[in-house]
């Protein structure tokens, strides 16, 4: 298998950042009825910039999108999962850019994967696990990926997170930073979040248990299973955890990523992806700068042919 580094991009995470994390909007060049191209432009700009700045050479790049029914299984377990996220209006704006983004990836030879009944993080966990000998970088702002991190060792490569929203020099996150900042190892990160909560996924955690308390309870390599016999579940906080025990285990199951998603054959090819051109050129090749008949737009033809 290839020793070429593998970059796995959380497509929806980058898509929403491209849409809502940019102070200035980018519009088409139409004289009238200008169209907002911020999401499409910034998606490619952020993808290219992060890789160019943080990696010595272009890796194999695979962009992974959430499936349409990706969160269904977790929502069956807990109806509150991600229930705090807006579902309409402005929240749909990034999704409307998906056809053009996918077409741009196709046009410039960047692989993308979407499994209809899986979330992107589970697909990324599966792809990372499928090539343990390779160095893997996960492009995302989502801290849930911290559970996948590992240092390089005999027979296996590293897994790190690349968060390009952070300042230069601190964008690549490995196990040492997770231990320093959160007080737990990557292997215990799902246990830690089950106790302390994860607001982004609407997982409340145990009432009265914050990040520091959760880390202290798990100190020394403990897991949830080892807590009842540890002598640490004392006082009001211990009672709160004991009372919510089954719910805590359920939350951890939701936070844990699935490493066995059936991904499409050939999702990884083992060779470097050709470098992306600048975002302006991508938008130009997609025929989006100036209004055109749909049949004249490269991205429309590519999307319709799928």
Pin down the residues of each PLM region.
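Noncatalytic, basic helical substrate-engagement surface that gates or grips nucleic-acid strands
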Residues: 2-139, 147-163, 167-168, 249-262, ...
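Non-catalytic nucleic-acid-binding/docking modules located in mid-to-C-terminal regions
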Residues: 50, 55-62, 166, 172-306
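Alpha-helical elements of the RecA-like P-loop NTPase motor core of helicases
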Residues: 122, 146-147, 215, 225
């Amino acid at each position: 298998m290839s020793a070429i580094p593998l970059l796995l991009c959380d497509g929806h995470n980058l898509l929403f950042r491209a849409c809502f994390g940019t102070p200035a909007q980018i519009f088409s060049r139409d004289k009238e009825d200008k169209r907002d191209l911020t999401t499409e432009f910034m998606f490619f700009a952020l993808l290219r910039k992060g890789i160019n700045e943080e990696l010595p050479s272009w890796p194999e790049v695979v962009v992974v999108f959430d499936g349409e029914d990706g969160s269904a299984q977790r929502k069956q377990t807990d109806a509150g999962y991600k229930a705090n996220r807006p579902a309409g209006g402005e929240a749909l704006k990034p999704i409307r850019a998906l056809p053009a983004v996918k077409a741009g990836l196709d046009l410039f030879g960047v692989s993308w994967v979407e499994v209809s009944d899986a979330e992107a993080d589970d697909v990324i966990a599966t792809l990372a696990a499928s090539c343990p000998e390779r160095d893997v970088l996960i492009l995302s702002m989502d801290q849930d990926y911290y559970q996948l991190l590992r240092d390089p060792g005999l027979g296996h490569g590293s897994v790190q997170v690349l968060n390009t929203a952070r300042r230069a020099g601190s964008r690549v996150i490995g196990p040492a930073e997770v231990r320093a900042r959160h007080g737990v190892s990557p292997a215990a990160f799902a246990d830690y979040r089950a106790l302390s909560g994860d607001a982004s996924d609407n997982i409340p955690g145990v009432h009265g248990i914050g990040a520091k308390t959760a880390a202290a309870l798990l100190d020394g390599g403990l897991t949830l299973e080892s807590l009842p016999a540890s002598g640490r579940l004392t006082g009001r906080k211990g009672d709160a955890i004991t009372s919510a025990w089954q719910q805590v285990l359920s939350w951890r199951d939701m936070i844990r990523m699935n490493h066995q998603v059936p991904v499409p054959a050939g999702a990884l090819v083992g060779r470097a992806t050709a470098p992306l051109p600048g975002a302006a050129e991508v938008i130009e090749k997609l025929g989006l700068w100036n209004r055109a008949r749909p049949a004249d737009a490269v991205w429309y033809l590519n999307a319709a042919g799928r």
